[in-house]
Amino acid sequence: MTLHTPPAFDALLAAAPPQVSAEQARAVAAQHFGLHGACRLLSGERDLNFQITCADGAQFLLKVSNAAEDPLVADFQNQALLHIQHCDPTLAVQRIYPNNSGSYQITVLFDGQPLLVRLFSFVEGISLNRVEHPDVALRSSLGEHLARLGLALRGFFHPGAGHELLWDLKHASRLSDKIGLIQDPQERQLAQHFLDNFERHAQPHLKGLRAQVIHNDLNPHNVIVDASQPHPVRNILDFGDMVHAPLVNDLAVGVAYQLGTQGDPLAHAAPFIRAYHRIAPLEPLEQSLLVDLIATRLVLTVTITNWRAALYPENRTYILRNAPSAWRGLRALADVPREVAQQQIRRICSEETL
C-alpha cells in the first residue's frame, strides 16, 4: 500500500478538506439560512467548520462537508440528531437547523465544486481537552451523557447507518497495512500487539453483541464544558463518525480518552464507567471485552492519525492532537495483564449495583 492510493473503504479519510473561504461561507449563511454576521474558520480535519456570529449575538456553526461525503450518510447524521432531540430533549448534544427551504442539507457550488452545507448550533465554552485535571464529577457527568445518548439512539435506523468507516472498531483488522507505516519499531510492535489481541479475543464475539447506531467519537475535543465550572457537560459535538455497531464500542471509545497514565490506567476511568453502567448496564460479555475494545480504539487513533498526518503534513498538528495521549494509554494498558483489567472492570460495574 502507498500513502496516496487508498482503497475505497478509506476514501473519506484520505480525501483533502474542501477549499472554501470565510467570505464564501458568510455569503452562503446569508443566502440560504438568512444569517448575517461575522464568519470565522474553525479547526477541522476532513470538513470545514465556520463560526457565524450574528449582530444580536446568536452563534451558529456552518459545516461544509468533504467532497467525498455521501449525501445519504449526511442525512443519516441529520436524522439522528433530530431523533435524539425528540427522544431526550434535554440531552446536551449539537442541534441542527433547516435552511430557508426547510431542508437540513443543501448542495452549494464553490468554484464549480458541489459541496454539502449544513447549519448546527454553536455552544460557548471550552473543549474537554483544555481541562487539565477533570474531576470525578465531570467524568461521571460524561459517562451519564454517553449512556443517555445511547438510550436516545436505541431503535433509530436509517439507510445510511450501514456505511463503512475506518474508525469503526469492528473493522479494526483492516488497519494491518497502516500499522506498518508507524516508523518507531517499538510503537509499531505495541500497536500490533493490541490489534492481535482484538482479533484473538474480541472480534469472534462482535456479531453476538447488542448493536445499534452509536456516536463513536467521544474524544475530549468533541465535548464542550463551562470554562469557569467544568462539571456539567454543555455539549457533545461531531456526529460525523456515527455507525451501526456494537453498543459497547461507544463506551470503549469514550473510556480510551479517560485512562490514567500514572499507575492504574482504569482507576481514572472508573467514574466514567460506573456512571455509564448505572444508566445503561453492561452485559457480562460486554464487560469482558471492554478492555480489548478500549485498547483497539487507541490503536485506531495512533494508526489512522499517523497515516493521515503523512498524507496532509500541513494539517499534521491538528490531525495528531490525540495521538500522544493514545500512545500513553497503550503503554499503560500494556503494563496491566488482560485478566486483571477484566476483573477490575467487573468490579467497577458491580460497585454501582451493590
List PLM regions with ranges.
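Active-site acidic catalytic loop and adjacent metal/ATP-binding pocket
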Residues: E45-G57, L61-L62, I96, E199-N249, ...
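Active-site activation/catalytic loop segments of kinase-like enzymes and analogous catalytic loops
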Residues: L247-P281, A295-P313
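An alpha-helical support segment within catalytic cores of ATP-dependent transferases
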Residues: Q19-A29, G155-H158, R174-N216, D226-S228, ...
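Juxta-kinase regulatory segment immediately upstream of eukaryotic protein kinase catalytic domains
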Residues: M1-L35
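A glycine-centered beta->alpha junction motif in the catalytic cores
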Residues: G102, Q113, V117-V131, A172-I182, ...
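A conserved alpha-helical element in kinase catalytic cores
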Residues: V64-G112, V131, V136-S140
